[in-house]
């Protein structure tokens, strides 16, 4: 940038001492130093902002590349699953045609899903309804809390009774 050596700085200082005078030179030097510091901070902020924008643009490019790769993988998986499903259906269709179709325990090819089995098993959805359905003797036997206390209330309840502490000033 600007090539300032020791000799050039000494020359600038001597000229400033003659022009400005020895009384105002320290104040002017402080002001110039503060302005140079501000300029350096501003330049550093601009550099940091530019580098952040460049990194952000690179991250955006990486994100789009990653999303494209994920879409390609998803398409490939769906394609393979569809092909395997079709092959399985064709194989099952061929097996049904050769079996004669007189099987009573086949169930019509219905396979229940996990969700249907889960709903049939649980029945109730609400946690409160499930908890309320249990009898009180069962809750007592299995240590299910019926009456919940806060931590502070529990500490107060179980803290041993002590006599009041005396003040330092009494």
UniProtKB/Swiss-Prot annotation:
The chain crosses the membrane at residues 1-21. GO terms for biological process: protein transport by the Tat complex. Keywords: Cell inner membrane, Cell membrane, Membrane, Protein transport, Translocation, Transmembrane, Transmembrane helix, Transport. It is a single-pass membrane protein. It comes from the Bacteria. GO terms for cellular component: TAT protein transport complex. Its main location: membrane. It is found in: Cell inner membrane. GO terms for molecular function: protein transmembrane transporter activity. NCBIfam families: tatB. Belongs to the TatB family. The Tat system comprises two distinct complexes: a TatABC complex, containing multiple copies of TatA, TatB and TatC subunits, and a separate TatA complex, containing only TatA subunits. Substrates initially bind to the TatABC complex, which probably triggers association of the separate TatA complex to form the active translocon. Part of the twin-arginine translocation (Tat) system that transports large folded proteins containing a characteristic twin-arginine motif in their signal peptide across membranes. Together with TatC, TatB is part of a receptor directly interacting with Tat signal peptides. TatB may form an oligomeric binding site that transiently accommodates folded Tat precursor proteins before their translocation. This is Sec-independent protein translocase protein TatB.
